[in-house]
């Protein structure tokens, strides 16, 4: 594991006084040290072992950043804050130690070969503590991305919080926003192309201008591209201000219009607004 060195500045001396400042040798070493730090932050540190990372197969800078691939023995030393690591537990579980951080510091781990498992986990130990974790944080899901960020660094101790997510999969939200229901009493909201997803789950909230009438619901929709239909199931419905049990406040229907799955929301209440968010999607054919 390459140990980064603090930034070095060349002493340029005093103008007109040739006897001041760094000599060429010292200045060149400082430049090399600074460039090594840059290339080892944004490139493969393993390539430093050959010709200091130079040559045809030497280090290159990755604009997206680089997740370092270290051996298990190298992780006996605490990892530096601000670094990224690609963890391989193919042969045995890996334990990493995070050094004390300052507020806002971040460390990231990924598992690009999917080797993390219950048998060979990634174990993360903070020198101080990880919020909500008693002892070490143990990650057992393959292809995980773990992000830790320092949320407190008072009195010489630091507290880290974390998130764990899959490296892969579709995570986009094809539709999210707020629409005004027009004076005609309805609004069409295009969600996504009819062939883009097989099903989707939505959160829908409708509210009057004065806030006295509110309806919220979760809705599952299934896209039938053969018959050009959308089948929906509305559940977890909550209403405020409905005059009778039959008063829906707002009606939500789905159809395919101009090749787009479309939500049509209608209401007899003037000035109603509708917030719609697609919170999950599913498509046959997504990679495992």
Curated annotation (Swiss-Prot):
Induction: Expressed in the late phase of the viral replicative cycle. SUPFAM superfamilies: gp9. One of its GO terms (biological process) is viral release from host cell. Keywords: Coiled coil, Viral baseplate protein, Viral release from host cell, Viral tail assembly, Viral tail protein, Virion. One of its GO terms (cellular component) is virus tail, baseplate. It is found in: Virion. Residues 20-80 form a coiled coil. Pfam families: T4_gp9_10_C (PF23618), T4_gp9_10_N (PF07880). Its main location: virion. InterPro entries: Baseplate_gp9_C, Baseplate_struct_prot_Gp9/10_N, Gp9-like_sf, Gp9/Gp10_mid_dom_sf, Gp9_C_dom_sf. Homotrimer. The gp9 trimer interacts with the long tail fiber (LTF) that comprises gp34 trimer, gp35, gp36 and a gp37 trimer. Part of the baseplate macromolecular complex which consists of gp5, gp5.4, gp27 (central spike complex); gp6, gp25, gp53 (inner baseplate); gp7, gp8 (intermediate baseplate); gp9, gp10, gp11, gp12 (peripheral); gp48 and gp54 (proximal region of the tail tube). The C-terminus is bound to the baseplate, and the N-terminus coiled-coil domain is associated with the long tail fibers. Peripheral baseplate protein that is part of the tail fiber network. Connects the long tail fibers to the baseplate and, after virus attachment to a host cell, probably changes its conformation to trigger the signal for tail contraction. Involved in the tail assembly. This is Baseplate protein gp9.
